[in-house]
C-alpha cells in the first residue's frame, strides 16, 4: 500500500527517502505498479531494498504492516445433507513471482495447514445466491474451477428435495477447468447428480486438454437451444434463473456475452433487445452472480 511506503519514507535516510516518497506519490503510479503490483513484491522484500527505513514497532503496526482483510468463500454444502457440517472449497494460492519468491496465499495456506479439530474464526453473510423456492423452477448453473462451490450445495439441496418426493425442474450445470485429469473437482458428485436426475445436463469445458482452448461460455453457446427457453422463462412452471460463480474479470463477462449471443441467435433479437432481457433478469433476481 502507498500509505506503508510513505510511512517507510518518514523514517528512511539518503536516497531511500526520495525513492520511497516518489513510489507513494500520485506521480509514481506507474513505477509503483512495476515495482510492487506486477511482481507481487512483499513488504519484507521492500524493506530489504530500503535498509535505511527502520520503523519502530508503533509505526510498523500502525501504518506499515497491512491489516488482514477477511476472505470470503462460498459455502459448498447444504444443511439438507448435513445440518452439522459446513464446507468450503478453496483453491490454495501458491505461485512463483517475478522476484523469485514463492508467494503463498495467507488464508488459503492457513486453511490447508489447519489441523483436524482446530478452531477457525468465521462469520456467515446473508446471501441471495440460493435456489428458487419452487424446486420446479428451471435453473442454469455456471461455475468453472472453485466456482462450482455453491453449486455443490445446490446439488445436495436438490438431492434432498428429490428424496422427499418433490418434482424437480430442469437444471443445467456448466463446469470448466484446465485439465480433466488434474482439475475436475467433485467429478463423482456431478456425474452421480446427472445419473440420479438431480441435474438434467452436465457440460464440462477443459481449456488445456485439446488443441483448442474450450471454456464454459463455448459450452453455453453449444447448448443455445436448451439454454434459451430457460433464460426466456418459457419452460417449466416458474421463470428460470441463471447462477454464475467464479472469476469476475474474464469469465463472468464472457458468460454474459455468451448469453447475449444465445438470445440473439435463438430469439432473433437485436443486441440492445438481448441486453434489455438480461437487464430485466437481473432486476427480477433471476440473474445471480457470486464473483471475485
Residues covered by each model-derived region:
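FNR-like FAD-binding dehydrogenase module
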Residues: 1-292
Amino acid at each position: 500500500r502507498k500509505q506503508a511506503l510513505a510511512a517507510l519514507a518518514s523514517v528512511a535516510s539518503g536516497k531511500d527517502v526520495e525513492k520511497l516518497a516518489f513510489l507513494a506519490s500520485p506521480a509514481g503510479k506507474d513505477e509503483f505498479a512495476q515495482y510492487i503490483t506486477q511482481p507481487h513484491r512483499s513488504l519484507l522484500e521492500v524493506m530489504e531494498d530500503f535498509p535505511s527505513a527502520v520503523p519502530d514497532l508503533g509505526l510498523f503496526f500502525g501504518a506499515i504492516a497491512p491489516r488482514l482483510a477477511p476472505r470470503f468463500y462460498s459455502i459448498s454444502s447444504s444443511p439438507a445433507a448435513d445440518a452439522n457440517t459446513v464446507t468450503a472449497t478453496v483453491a490454495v494460492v501458491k505461485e512463483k513471482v517475478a522476484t523469485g519468491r514463492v508467494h503463498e496465499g495467507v488464508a488459503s495456506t492457513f486453511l490447508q495447514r489447519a489441523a483436524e479439530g482446530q478452531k477457525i474464526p468465521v462469520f456467515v453473510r446473508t446471501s441471495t445466491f440460493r435456489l428458487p423456492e419452487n424446486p420446479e423452477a428451471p435453473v442454469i448453473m455456471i461455475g468453472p474451477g472453485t466456482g462450482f462451490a455453491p453449486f455443490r450445495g445446490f446439488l445436495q439441496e436438490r438431492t434432498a428435495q428429490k428424496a422427499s418426493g418433490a418434482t424437480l425442474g430442469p437444471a443445467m450445470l456448466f463446469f470448466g477447468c484446465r485439465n480433466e485429469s488434474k482439475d475436475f473437482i467433485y467429478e463423482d458428485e456431478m456425474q452421480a447428480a446427472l445419473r440420479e436426475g438431480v441435474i438434467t445436463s452436465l457440460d464440462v469445458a477443459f481449456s488445456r486438454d485439446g488443441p483448442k482452448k474450450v471454456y464454459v461460455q463455448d459450452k453455453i453457446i453449444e447448448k443455445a437451444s436448451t439454454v434459451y427457453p430457460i433464460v426466456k422463462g418459457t419452460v417449466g412452471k416458474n421463470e428460470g434463473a441463471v447462477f454464475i460463480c467464479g472469476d469476475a474479470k474474464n469469465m463472468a463477462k464472457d458468460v454474459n456475452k455468451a448469453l447475449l449471443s444465445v438470445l440473439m441467435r435463438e430469439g432473433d433479437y437485436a443486441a440492445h433487445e438481448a441486453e434489455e432481457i438480461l437487464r430485466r433478469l437481473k432486476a427480477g433476481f433471476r440473474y445471480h452472480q457470486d464473483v471475485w
